[in-house]
């Protein structure tokens, strides 16, 4: 990735960075919650974004 990015690319990367985090613990603690983990986590080496 180049150091000179367009704003569109930068915004896209920022969104992906925010999405790539575990679910909050309080969501797991909710009664009847079936969500155990964030199934859409992405590892920087294994799966690329396709830019």
Swiss-Prot record:
One of its GO terms (cellular component) is cytosolic large ribosomal subunit. The keyword Plastid does not apply. Keywords: Cytoplasm, Ribonucleoprotein, Ribosomal protein. Pfam families: Ribosomal_L39 (PF00832). InterPro entries: Ribosomal_eL39, Ribosomal_eL39_CS, Ribosomal_eL39_dom_sf. One of its GO terms (biological process) is spermatogenesis. HAMAP family: Ribosomal_eL39. Component of a male germ cell-specific 60S large ribosomal subunit (LSU), which contains RPL10L and RPL39L, instead of RPL10 and RPL39 paralogs. The composition of the rest of the complex is similar to classical ribosomes. This is Ribosomal protein eL39-like 2. The lineage of its organism: Eukaryota, Metazoa, Chordata, Craniata, Vertebrata.
């Amino acid at each position: 990735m180049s150091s000179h990015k367009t704003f569109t690319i930068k915004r896209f990367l920022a969104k992906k960075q925010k999405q790539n985090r575990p679910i909050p613990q309080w969501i797991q603690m909710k009664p009847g919650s079936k969500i155990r983990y964030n199934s859409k986590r992405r590892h920087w080496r294994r799966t690329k974004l396709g830019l």
